[in-house]
Amino acid sequence: MNSRTPMLLLAAALALGACKPAEDPQVAIAAKAAADEKAAEAMAQSFEAAVALNKWDVARAHGDVLTAQYPNSKAAARIKAQYEVAKVEAVKALEARRLAALWSYQTEPVISGGEQRSAALYAKDHIDTDGGGAHEVRLIFRDHPAWGRSSYLVLQAGDFDCYGGCKVKLKVDDAAPKPVAASRPKTDEATAMFIEDERMLWRTVRGAKTIAIEFPVKAGGTRTAVFEVGGLDASRLPGWK
C-alpha cells in the first residue's frame, strides 16, 4: 500500500466530518427539557404517594426538591396546591411530635400485685421555688392498684405551702383562671401537692393545649408552672376516663 494512503483516508474522513451539519441547538434544548420533565414527574409521583399516606414531612421534602430543581415544570404546576398544604401539615406534624415527646410514661410492677402506671411531663420553664434558683416542676398522673388514681405536682426544690389544703389557680389555654382544691400530704417521700379532683384535671388536660397552675410555696408568695399538655397519649393510662 502506498504510504500516503492512510493519510489520504484520514483526510477524507475529516472532510466528511466537516461536511456533517451541526446539531440543532433547539433539538438539544428540547431533549434536556424532556429529560427534566421526566425527572420532575418522578418526583411529583413520589410527592403524591407520600401525600396519600399522610406522610407530610416526606411529601414536603419531595416538594421542596421538585420546586427548587424544576420550578417551571408541568409536574411542579400540578402539585402546587397540594405542596402548599403539605408545607402547613408538615409543620403541624413536627409540632405534634415535639409535644408528644414531652410526655413520659411508665409501667411498674407493684409488690402487692398489679401494676402502677403513670404519665408525666415537666413544666415548660424552670421555676425558682425555694429562692435559690430555677428548678424543675413536674405534673404526674398516677394509677396505682392499691392507692387508686391521683394527679399531683412535684417540686425539685423548696416546698408547697399547702399543708392541710389550699386553693390553686388553674388556667386552661386562653380561659380565665379558676380555683381548684389541692393538698400537700405530710410526708417526706416526695415534695408533692395533689390536685384533689384528679378526674377533672385529666379531662381538662385531654382537651387542652396548655395549662398553667399557680400554687403557693413556703419560700413566700405563689409560683406558676405552665405545661404544654397537647401531646398526651391518653391510651397509655386506660383506666382514666
Task: For each feature predicted by the language model, list its residue ranges.
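Bacterial N-terminal signal peptides that target proteins for export
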Residues: 1-9
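C-terminal motif of bacterial Sec signal peptides marking the signal peptidase cleavage site
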Residues: 15-18
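A generic "folded-domain core" signal
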Residues: 20-68, 74-241
